[in-house]
């Protein structure tokens, strides 16, 4: 569905939206044919910590319906922090993960993922982060291209999340 990006509302959302995030995630899995390699399946428990500051979760709304969301996750010194795999990052606490960015299938192709990336970068800068990193399936050229269009560079390919091959990208902000 073609929409005008100026008709969208992007705003921080709270933990009460997790059921909607999971619904959008499952819609994406169904659209992708159920491939578990394309996207890591998250649960309520894996998403809940993303709502703790300084992490940020943004929802994108069109006519009052959430059509997309993005998560900037401050993983700190936990094993979730992608900075451990990036040699240039000397202090992992300076990195935030772009954990998830999902657009409902009917609304793809409108620049929404790039809009989310830019807004999440802004939040990261305001919180004092120096780096943002993200992993993307090599079978997801759309997200790879969107990240690269936003200035992210490929660091390496590696196995994450129980053996899934991912492209690690990073950007100094």
Task: Give the positions of each predicted feature.
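A short beta-loop-alpha structural element at the N-terminal edge
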Residues: 5-23, 34-35
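Active-site rim helix/loop that mediates acceptor-substrate recognition in acyltransferases
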Residues: 35-63, 71
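Conserved acyl-donor/pantetheine-binding loop and adjacent beta-alpha core of acyl/acetyltransferases
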Residues: 69-100, 161
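Conserved acetyl-CoA-binding loop-helix of GNAT-fold acetyltransferases
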Residues: 100-103, 109-122, 145, 149
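Conserved beta-strand-loop-alpha-helix junction that forms the acyl-donor binding cleft
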Residues: 108, 134-144, 162
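Conserved active-site alpha-helix within GNAT-family acetyltransferase domains
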Residues: 114, 126, 138-156
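Conserved GNAT acetyl-CoA-binding A-motif
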Residues: 124-136
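C-terminal "cap" of GNAT-fold acetyltransferases
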Residues: 150, 159-173
């Amino acid at each position: 569905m073609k929409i005008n990006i100026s008709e969208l509302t992007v705003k921080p959302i709270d933990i009460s939206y997790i059921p909607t995030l999971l619904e959008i995630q499952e819609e994406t899995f169904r659209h992708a044919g159920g491939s578990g390699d394309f996207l890591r399946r998250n649960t309520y428990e894996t998403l809940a910590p993303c709502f703790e500051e300084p992490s940020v979760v943004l929802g994108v709304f069109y006519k009052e319906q959430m059509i997309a969301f993005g998560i900037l996750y401050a993983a700190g010194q936990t094993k979730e922090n992608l900075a451990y795999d990036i040699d240039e990052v000397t202090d992992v606490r300076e990195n935030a993960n772009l954990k998830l960015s999902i657009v409902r299938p009917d609304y793809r192709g409108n620049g929404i993922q790039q809009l989310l990336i830019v807004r999440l970068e802004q939040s990261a800068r305001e919180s004092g982060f120096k780096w943002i990193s993200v992993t993307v399936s090599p079978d997801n050229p759309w997200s790879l291209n969107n990240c690269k269009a936003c200035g992210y560079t490929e660091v390496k390919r590696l196995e994450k999340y129980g053996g899934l091959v991912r492209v690690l990208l990073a950007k100094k902000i």
